[in-house]
Amino acid sequence: MIRGAHFSDIHYAGATLTEVDRCFTFAVNEAIDRGIDFAVISGDSTDHALDVHAPAVEALARNIRRLADYCPVLMLQGTFSHEPPGTLNVFRLLGGRYPVHVADRLEQVALLQGGTWQASASWRFDDAPQGMRALFSCVPTVNKATVAAAVGATEAAQAIGEQLSILLRGFASINETARKNGIATIGVSHGTVHGCMTEHGVPMAGFDHEFTTASLFSAGATAFMLGHIHKHQAWQQNGRLIAYAGSIGRLHYGEQGDKGFLLWEIGTDAARFDLVPTPAKRTIDIIFDGMPDLDDIRKCAQETGIDGAFVRVRWTMPEEDRHEVDRKEIERILNTAAEVKLEGRVIPVVRTRAAGISQEASIAAKVQAWAKATEAKGEPLLACLEALQQKTPEEIASDILTRPIVAQTAMHAVPDTECAAIAEEAKALEEPVELF
């Protein structure tokens, strides 16, 4: 039985430094206190390319060195946009008590009895090295652009999945030999498993993902440590386990579940792990379908306890009501939160077009469709349209000028004598009469 700590998706950067350094420092302390034989970081140690003088680089290096002073460390190449190729090379040079091995190619790595690493010359060992404590099969991020250039962009996703499945099956024989010799076998990779869940609860059910649980189990490793997906989740088969550690901290609003690292115990035929939570920041979402209700916000603030939390208020409302939201009052109610983020979604005013008008071929047919939808008379418009299509501007102007003017008869005024008579009759009736 061998014990190891599995960290993943740390994402050190300037913007994330406070959150991830607090969580990773805590995780390193916990791993050392609990006693581990090795540490694995399964990709995305950084969030993007970093300058060597950046505080995030110093903070990450400090914690990696602390780990290396306690046990051997394996760092896997993650997503290229987060860890550009070569980013991890500097960690090979930290010079701790134990070496840091950077797995940036397809390979197998043996953890020897003295706490050193021995990497295979090619993608796998032909014969298991002597004196192993554990055998790691490493599958770093695959460069999809290289695959697309070789097989075509439309076939790249399927080709990657097929080739990785063949590769993983290729590890099975050497892993079986190692298990028979009482050696723990461990897989480490960075990618997406078909059917896994994102940190926001969305299933990844597309056909362009690198792995399936079947292909990962086919490698014959007792434990398979994964990175890339920020939600902790696992699959089990006959005592063997596949698991995402999830991200070390909470980097976005709406992320579900605890954040932490996995503490593994791995034997030859079975494995187990515990999720050790880190002090990730607490996020709260307050969502309204319409106008934000200040009373509901106050109630939520009292019931959930917003002190020190990161609070996001979201609402959806018509465009004409957008100025009715009292943002300052919302911020005042939530003033004990560490951060308040207000996100209003405005529904724009939509003017409906006549149904089916875009499907008509001619302008005349479009006019008829519009007239039918609006219950208007279409004949005058069609007559004008015909004139525009068949006559010159001069002819149209001439027709307008020569049109006969319909004579209108003016209403004759009522003589003054008749008005006086009507007034006298009204007085006699003692009822008001409207004069015109």
Q: Residue ranges of each PLM-predicted region?
A:
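Conserved catalytic scaffold of divalent metal-dependent phosphoesterases
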Residues: 90-209
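Core catalytic region of metal-dependent phosphoesterases/phosphodiesterases
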Residues: 16-116, 213, 217-221, 229
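Binuclear metal-dependent phosphoesterase catalytic core
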Residues: 108-132, 240-314
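Conserved beta-sheet core of the metallophosphoesterase superfamily
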Residues: 95-98, 193-267
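Divalent metal-coordination and catalytic microenvironments
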Residues: 9, 24, 39, 44, ...
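Catalytic metal-binding/acid-base residues of hydrolase active sites
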Residues: 11-13, 45-46, 79-81, 107, ...
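Extreme N-terminal starter segment of soluble prokaryotic enzymes
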Residues: 1-5
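Accessory, non-catalytic peripheral segments of nucleic-acid enzymes
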Residues: 266-436
